[in-house]
Design a protein with these regions (language model features):
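SAM-dependent methyltransferase catalytic region
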Residues: 1-171
């Protein structure tokens, strides 16, 4: 396709946003839909300390479109409190970014192109996470990353990895 580069194709590139500063999703006088609030609480739990784990996080598929519409519809109702004002000014904008990130991390793609990490010594929280979530691949972060990126790819999609001969020396 000779016109590929002239099309408005947006790559899905992002830095991971954590939810460590968000204590809870619900806010009295603002959030009132239990189903949507449950999605918000899930996202807060899922992205706690997320920078340590990065794109390896398994994000469940929810109706994030409906959740985004819910976030866009939220307004202050009733008595204005310090908590509700803080929530609307601070938490709400963060949740809009987080749901966009969740959409990217729960979708499947026609093309996945990346540069896997080349470290085989895992420590701390990352080591614990890899053992729990990716046990068959726990020996090397490179293997875990390759597996996860095949998961991001559609069945008939393409995967491209920047992989020098390091793979020959994986233990």
């Amino acid at each position: 396709d000779r016109r590929f580069l002239t099309r408005e194709i947006e790559p899905n590139v992002s830095t991971i946003i954590e939810t460590n500063t968000i204590a809870k999703f619900t806010c009295e006088g603002v959030t009132n839909d239990k189903e949507q609030n449950d999605i918000g609480e899930y996202l807060i739990r899922a992205y706690k300390d997320a920078k340590e784990i990065g794109s390896l996080l398994p994000i469940e598929k929810y109706d994030f479109k409906a959740f985004t519409e819910y976030l866009n519809s939220l307004t202050l109702s009733g008595q204005l409190t310090l908590e509700s004002d803080y929530w609307v000014e601070g938490t709400l904008p963060e949740m809009k970014k987080i749901v966009k990130q969740a959409v990217m991390m729960s979708d499947k793609y026609a093309v996945v192109c990346t540069n896997p990490p080349y470290m085989n010594k895992l420590e701390g929280q990352l080591k614990k996470f890899v053992i729990e979530e990716y046990k068959p691949y726990k020996g090397d972060l490179f293997s875990v990353f390759m597996y996860k990126n095949f998961d991001y790819c559609k069945p008939d999609g393409y995967s491209a990895f920047m992989t020098p001969f390091v793979w020959m020396f994986i233990k």
